[in-house]
Amino acid sequence: MAITPGKTLDVTLPKDFLSILDWSPADLEKCLDVTGSLKRDRFLGRQAPTANRLSGQHVAMLFEKPSLRTRVTFEIAVRELGGDIIEPKLTATFGDREAAADVAKSLERWVTAVVIRTFAQERLDEFARATTTLHVINALSDTEHPCQALADIFTLQEYWQSFRNRTIAFIGDGNNVATSLAHATVKLGLTIHIASPSGFNLPDSVVDNVTRIAKKGASIKLFSDPWAAVNSVDAVYTDAWTSMGQEPEAKARRSVFLPYQVNTALMAKAKPDAIFMHCLPAHRGDEVTDEVMDAATSVVFDQAENRLHLSLIHI
């Protein structure tokens, strides 16, 4: 991918975006720098340097799960780049009606890129392995949410300028969002604390990977006590207690996660200027209270906005 805002910025990134693990720290830093340039151009009213980059090209969106921020921002990005969007109606779970590899080999004859939101990372990986020409983007799977993680670290960079000596705490389910956030933060030098109830911890394999890829000075620390996890941190992050597809477990999950609610008392344990983050949608009154969501230190809608600026990089 080559992008030319104001002055020439040549940025070469891996063909696919399936996991933060696939990107080097240098890739992440390049992505953040170019995104910042694109965002500045937008607010200064400059013509987008990426305009018409997809002219005459098509992007397919395969979504098994509902989506607001991911779908809208990718659709806007494709249109701003001059491309067309193809949204096949999925009548069965992606990869069930026919092999994911066969879907990939068909789509590569028609489209330039495919944005996939799926219940299974394995199907996404199978799809990507089957094509050498399609640009495949993970718009969320059961194990990772790399697009969200990029928006998160870009938002942190906007507020902090530097990641040096910064710590973020993730409170809640050790899920796909927590996984990608951990991958991204330690690659860029942050320390991350993750507090989860027993049985909902980050998988051991993820912890091993995070430890392996951590930049010098960065680390991951696991907690069962959310109060200890947020002590003197620079940012507090949470996510829904019940993810899509887990609705039958909602009542049981709520009873387990209630002590992990992010409220004003918990935020008071963090640094006085600590920011609050959430990938949305938020369930107010469950994982976070209205007071925290609507506080001046909440950056949740900045995160949502930045999904758009990052989508221009992904496509």
Residue ranges, per PLM feature:
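A short, gly/pro- and small-residue-rich
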Residues: R123-S141, P248-A270, A296-T297
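Phosphate/diphosphate ligand-binding glycine-rich loop within oxidoreductases
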Residues: R46-Q157, R284
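Glycine-rich phosphate/diphosphate-binding loop of Rossmann-like nucleotide-binding domains
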Residues: E64-T73, W160-S232
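Conserved small/polar residues in nucleotide/adenosyl-binding loops
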Residues: I313-I315
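Positively charged, low-complexity intrinsically disordered leader regions
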Residues: A2-V72, I76
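Rossmann-like dinucleotide-binding domain for NAD(H)/NADP(H)
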Residues: D273-A274, A282-L310
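Rossmann-like adenosine-cofactor binding region
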Residues: T211-D290
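Phosphate-coordination loops involved in phosphoryl transfer and adenosine-cofactor binding
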Residues: L54-V59, R164-R166, D273
